[in-house]
Amino acid sequence: MGFMGQPSGTWLGLINAVYSLGALVSTIFAAWCSNSFGRKLCVWLGIAFVLAGSILGAAAPNDTVFIVSRAVIGVSSGMVSNAPPLLLNEIAYPAHRSISSCLFMIGYYFGAVISSWVTFATRTYASSWSWRLPTLLQMLCPLVAIPGFLLTPESPRWLIGQNRVEEARKVLADLHASGDLTAPLVTQEIHEIQEAISAEKESAASSSYSDMIKTPGNRHRLLITVTLGIFSQWSGNGVVSYYLAMVLDTVGVTATKDQLLISGCLQIWNLIFGTIGAVLVERAGRRPLFLTSAGVMLVSYIIITGLSGSFASTGSAPTGTAVIPFIFIYFAGYDIAL
C-alpha cells in the first residue's frame, strides 16, 4: 500500500479536510473569475485543476504530495461548483431552469457511482494501485465532458454585461428559438437581462455590504443564506459519507468487501432519489421538499444513533445490521432536497 497504509485518525481527517480547504479558497476566487472573465474560463480552470490533481495524486511518491493533490482537487471543486450552475441557468430554456439546476447537483452521484464501484473492483489489488487507480479516475468525467463543453456557448448574461449584445442574441436564438434572431422570446430575454444588469449596477452604486445587516428583513435573509450552506454540511451527511467505513465498523460490518458493496449500492440509491427530487421540484415545491428532507433525516439519524448505541452495549448482530437500511433512508431524505 506504500505510504498510504490504512488511513485513520488525524491522517484520515487531514485527507478529507484539505479538500474542503482548497474548495474554500477557490470559491472566493471563482466568483470573481466567472464575473470578470466569463463562466467558461472558470470551468476550464476547474477542469485543469482536477486533471492536475488526479495525476498528481495517482503518482504521489509520499504523503505530502498526496495531500497537495487533494488540495488541488479541492480548488477544482470550488470552481466547478460556482461557474457551471450559473452557466447552466443562463443558457437553459426558461421553463427548464429549475430542473436543470437540480439535475446538475446529482451529477455528483453519477461520479460517485463510478468511483465507488471502481474502488470495489480494486479492493483486491495487493499494490498501491488499489487507491492510485481510483484517484487517477477522478479525471474520467471531466475528460468525457470536454468535447461537449467545447460546443457550449458562453453565458448570454455575461456577454450582455460585456456589451456583446449581438453575440448574446445569437446564443439565445440558437438555444431558444431555432436560430431566429428576431424571435419575441429572444428579444424579451435580452431586455430582461439588460434591465437586471442595470438594476444591479444602480444598487451596487448606492449600497454596501453593511446594508445586509441594517434592517430586520435583511438580517433574516442573510442568516438564511449563511446558515443554509453550513447546515447542509452539518446535517450528518459528511459523517455518514466520508466516514462510512468507520460508521459500519461501529455496528459490526467490518469486512472490506461488505463495506464497499454497501457504499456502491448507496451511491446508486442516491442517484435515483436525487433524480426524483429534481423531477419533483416544480410539482412539489422547494419548501415542502426541504421540510420533508429535514424530517426524514432527523428521524432516521436518531434511529441510527440509537441502534448504534444499542449495538455497542449488547453486540447484537441484528441490531447492527438494522442500521444499514436507516442509512439508506437518511440519504433518501438528504437527496430529495439536494
Regions found by a protein language model. Give the residues of each.
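Cytosol/matrix-facing amphipathic helices and coiled-coil assembly/linker segments
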Residues: 186-202
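Short intracellular "coupling" helices and adjacent cytoplasmic loop segments at the cytosolic face
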Residues: 175-188
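Alpha-helical transmembrane bundle of multi-pass membrane proteins
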Residues: 1-174, 198-338
